[in-house]
Amino acid sequence: MSLLSTIDSPQDVKRLDHEELVTLAAEIRDFLIHAVARTGGHLGPNLGAVELTLAIHRVFDSPFDRVLWDTGHQSYVHKILTGRREQFDRLRQRGGLSGYPSQAESEHDIIENSHASTALSYADGLSRAYELRGENRAVVAVVGDGALTGGMCWEALNNIAASDRQVVIVVNDNGRSYSPTIGGLADHLASLRLAPEYEQVLDVVKQVLGRTPLVGAPLFDALHGIKKGIKDVVTPQGMFEDLGLKYVGPVDGHDVVAMESALRRAKDFGGPVIVHAMTRKGFGYPAAEQDDADNFHAVGVIDPVTGKPKSASKGTTWTSIFSEEIVRIGSERPDVVTMTAAMLQPVGLKSFAKAFPDRVFDVGIAEQHAVTSAAGLAMGGLKPVVCIYATFLNRAFDQVLMDVAMHRQPVTFVLDRAGITGEDGASHNGMWDMSFLQVVPGLAIAAPRDAATLRAELDEAVSNTDGPTVVRYPKGKVAADSPAIDQVGGVDVLYRAPAAARHREVLLVSIGAMAPTCLDVAERVASQGIGITVVDPRWVKPLDPALVDLARDHDLVVTVEDNGRVGGVGACVAQLLRDADVDVPVREFGVAQRFLDHGKRDDVLAEVGLAPQDLARKVIEAVAKRQHALMGDEVGADESNQTPAGGGQA
């Protein structure tokens, strides 16, 4: 029997000796490689966090002591140790195990975290709550995988350091997020060892000098300042101590005994402590260790022996189309520069970086800084293209509004993973951008439907000089091009019902990548003898006035988008028609305003009613209801014009 098969809770880990822990670590790695190879997921980060996680669960008592995972994709080992090993066969699948911590799965999970740099703020609040409630509970926050490049971490550290609350911060220093971590902070993380005896002596000296009138406190400050100055000259690792945090490390994060010893010292101290663990992403799996790009940060279905994809990728992705096009644009325009927040490879900038290494800027996990820095680049005469996941632009709304739009800077935002992302779950769905960006004055939004329109609209966006632009598209493969059969103003007409159908009953406004779905819907609706026209506005902010004329020629307008309904494009179409005094009803179909669980994109869309068959049924029902209402109005009008029975002139 394997050791791993006997582990169902953290208590089972506590009974093991050193040799058994080493064996268990190896078994966990083997399990991870084979499990994630079957389903896909974040492999590299978790291979690097095995011993670290074992040590945490040996030293602390979860769930009484709370363990928080920043960049929650590094929590797989934690899930294994807390009784979820048997669920890994459905990792990131609908109804299966989440790829991030989940309160619904386990009492050992408290924050459902995948947006980076937040765990320390949670830890600050939790530890304050426990202190006020008189509960002696430790809070352990595991940060790393690039999270410390986010400014929110440092805001939290500043507050945590000003207390004596029991917060243990484990810095999982693998030097990478998706790729090598960028910035001065990454260079600054190195060794500052803390001896308990030294701290005890320092406290005694402080107490003695503190009892000496007038000169005691200034003398201590002077001596302490000399010590700090010498330390900073000899080893440039003083930033944590300068904040007021005790520091243990660096520790070999792949030596479970060393990690356990460091964590016990940190726990015994009783106040806020940094434990600096040096780890390697992909550790123990040669295929991952040899992958210079991202150490198998996230993989699809692979061969566990070779690490190669099980099947060749079929079709072209939205990201790869963008990658090719931005290189072409960059070759023609030397003023075009690109920026990303620790996502160089995932957003498709690797080729641009290779072609123009001095024109790509990776600022780390710092979306707010990225947006305002881009505004500065534009002010300096360049044309910045900020490439970011749609969900992460949520974090920089104020900067988009005030620093870019208010200054009318021609910054282009390329939002990858817009709409429903699928397996990454609620925190990664990009279903809010077309709502919150609608309120930004002077900003234009393009939603391409296919590869051809992505190329065209990206070119249009980069060529715009009057304010910011956005180009948004989903994760995954691009469907075949859907060429326009006509154009009305700037609106593409994609479909008109056959002549046999009654015309001008439904105007179906398709938004972005929902075009294949809308064309499917149109065929189903037309088969019922209903006249339907499908159009793509291309730019969804501002909406083309041609939509008003098109709406006037139809009895019903239907909008379909992979964005939240509240404040989405459908709502804007309805407002456009109201403002133009066009009395045509609008039915808006979009994503439900709730956090959606992980699963394949098509399955999630079906759950919220955006599958073609469901949409077609609703459109047909809406047409029937509309016709019934119109017939009722006509009958009522006829009756009102009739002379009442027995009537006549008086």
Swiss-Prot record:
Q: Which organism is it from?
A: Parafrankia sp. (strain EAN1pec)
Give the Gene3D superfamilies listed for this entry: 3.40.50.920, 3.40.50.970
Which reactions does this protein catalyse? Answer: D-glyceraldehyde 3-phosphate + pyruvate + H(+) = 1-deoxy-D-xylulose 5-phosphate + CO2
Q: What is this protein called?
A: 1-deoxy-D-xylulose-5-phosphate synthase
Q: Could you tell me the gene encoding this protein? A: dxs
What would be an example GO MF term here?
Answer: 1-deoxy-D-xylulose-5-phosphate synthase activity
- Pfam families referenced in this protein's UniProt entry, alphabetically: DXP_synthase_N, Transket_pyr, Transketolase_C
Q: Which NCBIfam families match?
A: dxs, PRK05444.2-2
Q: Which family does it belong to?
A: Belongs to the transketolase family. DXPS subfamily.
Cofactor(s) for this UniProt protein: Mg(2+); thiamine diphosphate
Q: Where, by residue number, does Mg(2+) bind? A: 145, 174
Summarize where thiamine diphosphate binds, as residue positions.
73, 114-116, 146-147, 174, 285, 367
